[in-house]
Amino acid sequence: MSEAAQTLDGWYCLHDFRTIDWSAWKTLPNEEREAAISEFLALVDQWETTESEKQGSHAVYTIVGQKADILFMILRPTLDELHEIETALNKTKLADYLLPAYSYVSVVELSNYLASGSEDPYQIPEVRRRLYPILPKTNYICFYPMDKRRQGNDNWYMLSMEQRRELMRAHGMTGRKYAGKVTQIITGSVGLDDFEWGVTLFSDDALQFKKLVYEMRFDEVSARFGEFGSFFVGTRLPMENVSSFFHV
């Protein structure tokens, strides 16, 4: 039996995608729309406080295309806290007009494919920064779930640890070419959602998503073993722009 990779696990993550029922939203009197927006912004203020205390992070993006209209990405120390946030959002007036489109539950993950020393990795500042990240405030976001293939000779889970480590090392070298252009957060979801990992990319240049993903397709680990779900791409929604976004 092949050796399982050990993981370092950080904050839990929820990608909550919604579509907006614009037709119903337009029927609300203006005062009620403004009250709903104010209530939502008060909720986000709570998220901002949590982020300032480095007890979690969040991002809000509007999604381009018809798969969804808006994304709430939330990071918290526990699954219970994610559930509380999701429930609190669902109880707002605005949520009456936010229809579920897609969701993904996972946990920020680093694997042990790259060898490390004897030091406790959870005490290394750079490791902690990656496990408990404050999400970038970039202009664009790209999210997609993925699996490792388990078919015939292309069965990732039948490879030895050494083979997997070498393939991931080469894959990581491709990613490092985009340092400073794209920030990547990998979240593990085996046993938590339908795919095995979620990949979230942040950049101020959306074209870098295409370039990075395309170049990585030529890495053996992706060409032989990568299987992908739907891609979601969006633009950042600053809180000062929420009122204008929902204005009708």
Swiss-Prot record:
Q: Which reaction does it catalyse?
A: Fe-coproporphyrin III + 2 H2O2 + 2 H(+) = heme b + 2 CO2 + 4 H2O; Fe-coproporphyrin III + H2O2 + H(+) = harderoheme III + CO2 + 2 H2O; harderoheme III + H2O2 + H(+) = heme b + CO2 + 2 H2O
Swiss-Prot/TrEMBL keywords? Heme, Heme biosynthesis, Iron, Metal-binding, Oxidoreductase
For this chain's UniProt record, which GO biological process terms are given?
heme B biosynthetic process
Q: How is the cofactor bound?
A: Fe-coproporphyrin III acts both as a substrate and a redox cofactor.
Residues that coordinate or bind Fe-coproporphyrin III = 130, 144-148, 171, 184, 222
**Enzyme Commission number(s):** 1.3.98.5
Task: Kindly give the InterPro entries that the UniProt entry links to this protein.
Answer: CHDC, ChdC/CLD, Dimeric_a/b-barrel
What is annotated as the active site?
144
Enzyme kind, highest EC tier: oxidoreductase
Does the record bear Nucleotide-binding in its keywords?
no
Question: Which SUPFAM superfamilies does the UniProt record give?
Answer: Dimeric alpha+beta barrel (SSF54909)
The molecular function terms in GO held by this entry are: heme binding; metal ion binding; oxidoreductase activity, acting on the CH-CH group of donors, oxygen as acceptor; peroxidase activity
Pathway(s) the chain acts in: Porphyrin-containing compound metabolism; protoheme biosynthesis
Protein's UniProt keywords contain Cell membrane: no
HAMAP family named in the record: Coproheme_decarbox_1
Give the similarity note.
Answer: Belongs to the ChdC family. Type 1 subfamily.
Record note on quaternary structure: Homopentamer.
Functionally, this protein is described as follows:
Involved in coproporphyrin-dependent heme b biosynthesis. Catalyzes the decarboxylation of Fe-coproporphyrin III (coproheme) to heme b (protoheme IX), the last step of the pathway. The reaction occurs in a stepwise manner with a three-propionate harderoheme intermediate.
This chain belongs to the protein called Coproheme decarboxylase
| Organism, scientific name | Geobacillus stearothermophilus (strain DSM 13240 / CIP 106956 / 10)
Q: What gene does this protein come from?
A: chdC
